[in-house]
A protein has these predicted regions:
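N-terminal secretory signal peptides that target proteins for export/translocation
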Residues: 1-7
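Short glycine-rich, low-complexity segments
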Residues: 6, 23-24
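Short terminal (N- or C-terminal) low-complexity/amphipathic segments
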Residues: 7-10, 31
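Bacterial N-terminal signal peptides
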Residues: 10-22
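Boundary at the C-terminal end of the N-terminal hydrophobic targeting segment
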Residues: 26-28
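Solvent-exposed, flexible loop/coil segments flanking beta-strands in beta-rich domains
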Residues: 32-80, 90, 241-282
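Accessory beta-strand-rich segments of carbohydrate-active enzymes
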Residues: 62, 67, 72-214
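Activation corresponds to long, low-complexity, non-globular regions
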Residues: 183-282
Length: 282
């Protein structure tokens, strides 16, 4: 029996590369609190948007997803004092949220696995405690999206036709409640958002892990490189609130090894890819 550690090694590399950036543990200081989704009709006030310059897979390419990470950025100016702020979000691809440069939510590999053409899970956060609430103050919303769950080989086992031509996309609705009780919603659109390929993530896939260049600034730090997005019409399925099967970093479950064993007379026992770069092209 030959021991195949490829999948486990890849999973470990994903977790490590998701955790670290040039500023340290980026997901260990997440802000925002999960809350109930807005009513489903709120999605009508938004569009799926993609970066015009986002690369796409044009052929099978050995199952490799398109390079680069799509970034989406918008700045919202308060018309009045804010007393409540909720952000309902969904992504075509694995996505990470930021408000004024701070990561929102502690989930990993959001939105998780669903049938890529039928259903996408949404995540809604109460971000009242982290936004600037004074009148005329500005808040920057930003999102990174990579191909996982949407445009990489995990969605099409046995064939890669499903990943051809797909662009990462983001959709969201910000609901602000003002001090006078009135509410206003800001959905993703082509006028108030910017998009482009940027940031330190140069390639990402569920099975393949990430290529990460920590010398590069985050997408919200180089907005001048972004431009007007385009509407994405590739997904026509349902957007449903997450059902509670998310992945979190559980430091409370960390265990320290007491003993270690080396198995002898087992074929492939010492064959593994720990510590090696396994995603890079040869």
């Amino acid at each position: 029996m030959k021991m195949n550690l490829h999948c486990f090694a890849n999973l470990i590399s994903i977790m490590i590369l998701e955790l670290f950036s040039n500023s340290g543990l980026i997901n260990a200081t997440e802000v925002g609190k999960r809350t109930d989704a807005l009513e489903a009709s709120a999605w009508n006030e938004s569009k799926w948007i993609s970066a015009v310059d986002a690369p796409v897979v044009k052929g099978h390419n050995n199952g490799r997803a398109a390079d680069g990470a799509s970034w989406f950025v918008s700045t919202v100016k308060n018309e009045q004092k804010i007393v409540s702020a909720k952000w309902m979000t969904a992504g075509l691809g694995v996505y990470e949220l930021y408000v004024n440069g701070k990561p929102v939510g502690g989930e990993f590999l959001k939105p998780g696995f669903t049938h890529y053409a039928k259903t996408k899970r949404s995540f809604t956060y109460d971000i009242t405690d982290i936004i600037r609430t004074k009148p005329n103050a500005e808040n920057m919303l930003s999102v990174q999206v990579t191909p996982g769950w949407w445009g990489d080989k995990i969605i099409t086992p046995g064939g890669y036709d499903g990943m051809i031509g797909k662009k990462c996309a983001f959709r969201g609705v910000l609901e602000l409640t003002f001090s006078d009780g009135n509410k206003k919603r800001y959905g993703t659109d082509l006028k108030n958002w910017k998009a482009g390929i940027a940031g330190p993530v140069k390639h990402a896939g569920i099975f393949d892990g990430e290529e990460y260049d920590a010398r590069e600034p985050m997408g919200y730090e180089c907005v001048d490189k972004l431009s007007t997005p385009e509407e994405n019409t590739e997904f026509s399925g349902d957007i449903l609130p997450s059902d509670g099967a998310e992945v979190y970093l559980r430091t409370d479950l960390a265990l320290a090894p007491v003993k270690a064993y080396v198995w002898k007379n087992v074929e492939g026992a010492k064959e593994n890819e720990f510590g090696k770069v396994i995603i890079a092209r040869e």
